């Protein structure tokens, strides 16, 4: 069996892996990047996550406003999504494939030992088949995560989908049941409701969006229900009864018939078949690779992105790359400890942006806080956009004026929330935001009113 020797081996063509490969190559280092599927160049976000789902959201909202039929809107949105994703995937591949120091190999990888990986499949850009071994000085694992499928009877039915399959339906379902009331489920609820699908969300929790303050969660639920989405809390799914024409979700709280069922039940580490134990790589109780603050799984093996148990966002995977890059090519000062606070966005309609502490968390931590809220309907730009649903909230230390947290459920929240990453990192006081000059009419100028009480 032929053995290839390389300085850097990257397993997985995700955000961190592809960016690190290009950077190392630009610094004169040889890189082999192994990816199991040629449909995953660029990682989850580009192919089966953020980009296709957001494209469907945008197309659905835009076309629905034109009063087209639900089926026509759905078909046009799918065509737009299907036209975009292959272009992005090809661009990601070409960027690395055109680099002299990078070799991309389509194959499945498994560890032989801490420095050796066996690859099976198409082991070269020309597509030759076979099994080879790669011996590397350094190995980086960036294999991401995959949908977690609960062991429920009937879950293998043809009309039961995970978050990947639901992005590629040939026809619009008239009725959809979403199992799971978390953020992924909410995004798809808004998406398919915009297409005209009847949507029901089932969640085994008794509390809707338990991580959010009750006023924010209540407003989100109000918006969903006002648009016709049904929400059932505190129900346990017992089985899926599948027939040729529909799937019935049987729960502790009744039965729900659907043309499509979405499992929005979380994600698990994509490590199956890697034989991590042969390399001395340990995983935690949830199956994610255990790493230190510099993303080392072992002295010569790093893990980056979802597979390392990092928060499951593409921009966090990019930050993982920065940590590793700083160790290899910089001063080695960056670590996971540097990102205790970062913004998040849920692409509902309106979007939900958040950073820092909620009011509930701040009070539980013993902080003396002042809180301000502002209804989106009070914002002139929201009226211009015709998007007056939502609620804005700021949590501030009552003594120092330090901004502890901000939650924005309103139009453009996914953009505006990023301002508060810089504000909190630089300890900008609430009074500065209150008196800041913003353009008009914009959603951002509402921050003057939101922070006026401080």
Residue ranges and their predicted role:
Residues 2-6, 16, 23-29, 33-172, ...:
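Glycine-rich flavin
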Residues 9-39, 43-44, 51, 55-56, ...:
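Flexible, glycine-rich terminal cap/loop adjacent to redox cofactors
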Residues 21, 25, 189, 193-194:
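Gly/Ala-rich phosphate-binding loop of Rossmann-like dinucleotide-binding domains
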Residues 9-11, 109, 133-144, 179, ...:
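Short hydrophobic core segments
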Residues 16-20, 160, 185-188, 271:
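Short glycine/serine/threonine-rich phosphate/pyrophosphate-binding segments
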Residues 156-171, 255-331:
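FAD-site-proximal beta/loop scaffold in flavoenzymes
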